[in-house]
C-alpha cells in the first residue's frame, strides 16, 4: 500500500535514535532531529503551531503570519507556510548565521533583522510592533508561550523516545530555547507513562544561566553567548520549571568542540546547540551514579546550518579557501 503525504509539513517526526560509540561510555543515545523535513527539531513546532491556528480558525486566507526567531523555528515556519500557502514575516537578531538568513529568503519569508545586542527580546519586540500595526492582518504565533509547541513534543517526540528505548530511558537532556521540547517530552514520559524517576536536564549557556538563577531564586541576569538556538535570556512560558530536575551550563568552547567531535568521531553533522547537549551528557557521566543510565539527548539541527560560524573556523588555510 502506497503512502503519499499531502504536503511536506505532514512528514515530521520519526527521527532516529543513534547510540554514540566513541563519545561517552555507549549509554548516550542521540535523537537526530536534523532528519526532519526542514532539518531541525523546530519542524515539529512549526507545523503544529500552524495546524493549531488553522483548527482554531484564527489562520485563514488573507492572514499573514509573524514570528520572532533565532533561525530554526523561522525556517520551520517558512517551509510549512510555503507548503500551505501563507505569507510569513520573521524578525531575527542580526547575529544569527548567514545560512539561516539565506534559507529563510529561499523559502519565501520576509525577513526583518533586529539589533544583535538586544537578542531575542529585541526580535520579540519588533514582531509585536508589526502585529500591533494591523492586528486584523497579522497573526503572531508566539513560540515561547504557544501551548501547541510543547503539545507536539508530548504527542510525537516523547512517544518516539519511549518506543525506541522500550521505556528504558533514565535521563532526558535538551537545550532550552523555548522550553517546548523539554516540557513536552518530560510530560509524556513522567506523566502519561508514569516514569516519575526520569531525570530531565535543561542545558543553557554558562554565559546566560537564567534557568539556574530562576531555580535558585536569584535575580535573572542574561548575557551574550554564541550557542545559537538556546539561551534566549529569559524564562519562556513554555518551560515548565517543575519538570526540570537538573540544569547544566555549557561554555561556547565546550559546545563547539563537542559538536566537532560528533562530526569527526561519530559521523553526525551536528550544530552548536547539539554539541552543548552532548557536552552536558558527558558532564553527567563524570558522576558515577550516571554510569549505567541510558541518557537520551536531543540533537536539534545539522552542522550545515553553521558553516559561517565559529563551528567551522580554522578548518582551512587562506590558500585552501582560494582554491
UniProtKB/Swiss-Prot annotation:
Recorded phenotype for the gene knockout or disruption: Significant decrease in tRNA nuclease activity of contact-dependent growth inhibitor CdiA-CT from strain 536 / UPEC (deletion in strain BW25113).
Reactions performed catalytically: O-acetyl-L-serine + hydrogen sulfide = L-cysteine + acetate; thioglycolate + 3-chloro-L-alanine = S-carboxymethyl-L-cysteine + chloride + H(+)
List of residues binding pyridoxal 5'-phosphate: 72, 177-181, 273
Keyword set, alphabetical order: Allosteric enzyme, Amino-acid biosynthesis, Cysteine biosynthesis, Lyase, Pyridoxal phosphate, Transferase
Keyword Amino-acid biosynthesis: yes
GO MF entries: cysteine synthase activity; identical protein binding; L-cysteine desulfhydrase activity; protein homodimerization activity; pyridoxal phosphate binding; S-carboxymethylcysteine synthase activity; transferase activity
Assigned GO CC terms: cysteine synthase complex; cytoplasm; cytosol
E.C. number(s) listed in UniProt: 2.5.1.47, 4.5.1.5
Catalytic temperature dependence: Optimum temperature is 50 degrees Celsius.
Residues binding hydrogen sulfide: 8, 35, 269
Subunit structure, as described in the record: Homodimer. Forms a cysteine synthase complex with 1 copy of CysE.
Biological role stated in the UniProt entry: (Microbial infection) In addition to its role in cysteine synthesis, stimulates the tRNase activity of CdiA-CT from E.coli strain 536 / UPEC; stimulation does not require O-acetylserine sulfhydrylase activity. CdiA is the toxic component of a toxin-immunity protein module, which functions as a cellular contact-dependent growth inhibition (CDI) system. CDI modules allow bacteria to communicate with and inhibit the growth of closely related neighboring bacteria in a contact-dependent fashion (experiments done in strains BW25113 and X90, both K12 derivatives).
Family listed: Belongs to the cysteine synthase/cystathionine beta-synthase family.
Protein name per UniProt: Cysteine synthase A
Amino acid at each position: 500500500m502506497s503512502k503519499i503525504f499531502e504536503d511536506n509539513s505532514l512528514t515530521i517526526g520519526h527521527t532516529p535514535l543513534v547510540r554514540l560509540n566513541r563519545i561517552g561510555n555507549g549509554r548516550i543515545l542521540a535523537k537526530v532531529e536534523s532528519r526532519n523535513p526542514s532539518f531541525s527539531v523546530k519542524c515539529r513546532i512549526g507545523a503544529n503551531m500552524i495546524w493549531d491556528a488553522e483548527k482554531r480558525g484564527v489562520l485563514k486566507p488573507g492572514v499573514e503570519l509573524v514570528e520572532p526567531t533565532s533561525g530554526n523555528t523561522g525556517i520551520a515556519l517558512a517551509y510549512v507556510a510555503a507548503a500551505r500557502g501563507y505569507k510569513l514575516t520573521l524578525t531575527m537578531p542580526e547575529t544569527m548565521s548567514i545560512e539561516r538568513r539565506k534559507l529563510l529568503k529561499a523559502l519565501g519569508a520576509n525577513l526583518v533583522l533586529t539589533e544583535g545586542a538586544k537578542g531575542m527580546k529585541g526580535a520579540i519586540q519588533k514582531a509585536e510592533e508589526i502585529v500591533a500595526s494591523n492586528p486584523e492582518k497579522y497573526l503572531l504565533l508566539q513560540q515561547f508561550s504557544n501551548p501547541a509547541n510543547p503539545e507536539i513534543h508530548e504527542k510525537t517526540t516523547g512517544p518516539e523516545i519511549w518506543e525506541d528505548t522500550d521505556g528504558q530511558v533514565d535521563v532526558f537532556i535538551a537545550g532550552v530555547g523555548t522550553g517546548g521540547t523539554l516540557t513536552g517530552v518530560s510530560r509524556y514520559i513522567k506523566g502519561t507513562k508514569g516514569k516519575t524517576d526520569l531525570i530531565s536536564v535543561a542545558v543553557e549557556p554558562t554565559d546566560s544561566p537564567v534557568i539556574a538563577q530562576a531555580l535558585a531564586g536569584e535575580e535573572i541576569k542574561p548575557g551574550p553567548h554564541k550557542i545559537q538556538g538556546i539561551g534566549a535570556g529569559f524564562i519562556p512560558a513554555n518551560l515548565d520549571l517543575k519538570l526540570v530536575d537538573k540544569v547544566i551550563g555549557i561554555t561556547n568552547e565546550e559546545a563547539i568542540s563537542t559538536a566537532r567531535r560528533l562530526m569527526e568521531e561519530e559521523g553526525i553533522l551536528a550544530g552548536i546547540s547539539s554539541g552543548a547537549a552532548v557536552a552536558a551528557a558527558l558532564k553527567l557521566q563524570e558522576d558515577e551514579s550516571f554510569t549505567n543510565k541510558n541518557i537520551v539527548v536531543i540533537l536539534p539541527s545539522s552542522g550545515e546550518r553553521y558553516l559561517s560560524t565559529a563551528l567551522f573556523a580554522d578548518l582551512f588555510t587562506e590558500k585552501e579557501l582560494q582554491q
